[in-house]
Every structure is written in C-alpha cells, then in structure tokens.
From Swiss-Prot:
Organism the protein comes from: Drosophila melanogaster (Fruit fly)
UniProt membrane topology term: Lipid-anchor
Entry GO MF terms: G protein activity; GDP binding; GTP binding; GTPase activity
Motif (Effector region): 34-42
Activity regulation behaviour: Alternates between an inactive form bound to GDP and an active form bound to GTP. Activated by a guanine nucleotide-exchange factor (GEF) and inactivated by a GTPase-activating protein (GAP).
Lipidation (S-palmitoyl cysteine): C46, C120, C147
SUPFAM superfamilies assigned to the protein according to its UniProt record, in alphabetical order: P-loop containing nucleoside triphosphate hydrolases
Protein name: Ras-like protein 2
Function field: May be involved in endocytic processes and/or other transport pathways mediated by vesicle trafficking. May interact functionally with ROP protein. Ras proteins bind GDP/GTP and possess intrinsic GTPase activity.
Lipid tethering residues (S-farnesyl cysteine): C189
Amino acid sequence: MQMQTYKLVVVGGGGVGKSAITIQFIQSYFVTDYDPTIEDSYTKQCNIDDVPAKLDILDTAGQEEFSAMREQYMRSGEGFLLVFALNDHSSFDEIPKFQRQILRVKDRDEFPMLMVGNKCDLKHQQQVSLEEAQNTSRNLMIPYIECSAKLRVNVDQAFHELVRIVRKFQIAERPFIEQDYKKKGKRKCCLM
C-alpha cells in the first residue's frame, strides 16, 4: 500500500505554543524556551486508523511581521491546525482571521481545519472557557480540541484528527474532480 503524504500547516498568533505542540508530536519533547519561529518543517510517519501516513508539518511564524509569508504556505497546505492559547484571549480572537485568510487563499467555502486550544494545563490562568471555544467552533464549522504541549495531552490526537478531516475532505472532493476531468475530456479541437 502506497503511503499517502499529508501537508499540514500549524498557524496561530505568536507565543501560543505552535512549535511546542509540533515538537512534542515529532520528538516527544517539551520546549521550555520561547524562540519565535520563522518557519520550520518536520516529517513524521505514523499509522492513523491502521492506515500508514507521512505527515509533512510546517510550523509557521505567529508574529505579525511575518504575515506576508502566510499566504505562501497556505497555498500548499492540505490541512491546518488553528492554534490559540487558552490563557490568551487575544490569540483566540485571531482564529476567525486565520480561517478567513485560508479560505480566501484556497478560494473555498470550507477546507480541512482543526481549532486547537493549547495550554489546557494552565487552568488557573484560563481566559477562554470551553463553552466559548465550542461556540466559536460551531460558528466557524471547525472541530475543536484542547491540548497541552507541556503535559502531552491530546497532542497526537490533534494531528491524527486533522489527518482524518483531510481524508474525509479528499473523499468528498473526488466526485467533483472526476466530474471536471470528464467534462474536460469531452472537449473537441477545431483547426482553422
């Protein structure tokens, strides 16, 4: 069986833990130092629902000064983790902006995304309630999961769930792609 590659992109504001989640998933290691990312890529092979998969993961810059680079990596992504920090409400407020930008770049009404509330281990500092996150998730029509990169809670589940979302999307898209291909095949050429 051919191993399918999935191009996943991790987006979100600065300091929300995008790199911590990604490195915890790839290397089972929690990064304690904050070193703003410009762009890092990682690869991991795993079995998701007993189907082998190769994940190409792009960890992106959250800082606004790198926002011009966002559209470039959004073009190639097949699935997106939209990460915010549960202890930083302003990072949560940015999630709809990231969703709109992805949909605009992809020229789609929907696309595979998973909203991730990181730092669920910091309950005493939490600024975004589960109810508020779930309401936004419903409004944006994006599934939601809470995780902790520090404690490795739901980290693997977030990436695996995103792959499941991508797979469902690709299966749903297949009839439309085949239909377009058949239409193109019926065109005739006329030489003058």
